[in-house]
């Protein structure tokens, strides 16, 4: 049961993503690939939170935790895009899912490198004792 608590940040953050993507926007920003950059950044944060959950709750191999983090992030990105089909003035874009996957991978790598640092090891050790 305690291990599920490590996924609360990811669940809350995904709820925020879902809420924000449920809104119809009339504002268009005419910067090339701006929306893809936003997808990468928001899903990099999700990747950080998912990585935190998997690293803290599983003692499996690095590869397994990487696959689970990236697979979960891609599924969540796909679900987010699918639900936008039902929102006025929103649409499904395949390249948004690609940007989401790049973001999740980036978030995983950031978490992995942080967790290998001295500060990251101390942080992880303190949390695992809770």
Language-model features and meaning:
Residues 1-88, 94-97, 101-130:
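Bulky hydrophobic segments
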């Amino acid at each position: 049961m305690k291990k599920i608590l490590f996924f609360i940040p990811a669940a809350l953050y995904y709820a925020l993503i879902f809420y924000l993507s449920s809104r119809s926007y009339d504002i268009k920003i005419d910067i090339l690939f701006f929306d893809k950059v936003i997808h990468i950044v928001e899903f990099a944060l999700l990747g950080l939170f998912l990585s935190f959950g998997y690293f803290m709750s599983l003692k499996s191999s690095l590869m397994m935790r990487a696959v689970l983090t990236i697979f979960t992030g891609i599924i969540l990105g796909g679900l987010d895009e699918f639900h936008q089909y039902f929102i006025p003035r929103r649409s499904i874009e395949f390249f948004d899912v690609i940007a989401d996957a790049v973001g999740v991978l980036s978030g995983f790598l950031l978490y992995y490198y942080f967790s290998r640092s001295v500060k990251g090891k101390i942080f992880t050790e303190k949390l695992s004792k809770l």
